[in-house]
Amino acid sequence: GALTWTLLARPVVKASSLASTPVTALTRKEIWSVISHPAVLLLVAADGGVLLQYTALTSWLPTFFNEVRDMSLSRGGFITGILPFVGVFAVLAGGILPSRFGLKPIFFVAPGMLIVVAGPGTFLSGNLIVIYASIVVLGIGSWLYVPTLLSLPMALPGMTPEKVGIVWGFIITVSGFCMFLSPLLVGAVRDIWGSFTPGFIVCGVAAWTLLLAGILMPRALNPTPAPGR
């Protein structure tokens, strides 16, 4: 599908719109003001923390289930595969709900609470029912916030398409680094201490940034003006 779009898609742009919306390069000062905005920093931290845990679990849970919970690799892989499967429906819900209720911090707080509760259950509990329930809830929490994450930058004051692109690039860069780092971190911790659990816990705590971002977002979007002298 992506290859077909790349080869066949053609932009539909009116000549009048091209003349009225010139593309201007951003200065370093403008770029810095965009990426240092408190709301943008919260978005970056939230997505990076969630993906730190998500990538660690999807990379290592099958091996963990096999070595620690005495499951077959195929069963461990099936259980882990529920995470992205549930995410398909969660991200759709995450796109529909804000369109009805607006871009509200609750769409960070609620998924953040799901992640805080369900994350540890995927590896600390040996009960199969708890594991399945934790995987499903974690899958919802790890994807429900994504549409709001990508839409919120467009609602920030003074944003232009160029600035929104900078924000998205910043988010993707940091999140990509977290996705690269987390499996290495869990693997290194396992080699040193002989257990996956400490690495999973570290990555799980990092995912709490989503809940923290939801709590702090109202203040970042509406900063209190400094008192006059």
Language-model regions, residue ranges each:
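Small-residue (Gly/Pro/Ala) motifs that create kinks and tight helix-helix packing interfaces
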Residues: 1, 5, 62, 94, ...
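A late C-terminal transmembrane helix in Major Facilitator Superfamily
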Residues: 158-195, 203
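Intracellular juxtamembrane helix-capping segments at the cytosolic ends
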Residues: 144-159
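Extracytoplasmic gate region of multi-pass secondary transporters
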Residues: 38-94, 182
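Hydrophobic core of transmembrane alpha-helices in multi-pass small-molecule transporters
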Residues: 130-144
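Flexible cytoplasmic inter-helical loops of multi-pass small-molecule transporters
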Residues: 7-30, 224-229
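Structural signature of the two symmetry-related core transmembrane helices
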Residues: 106-121
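Symmetry-related core transmembrane helices of the 12-TM Major Facilitator Superfamily/SLC fold
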Residues: 1-7, 198-216
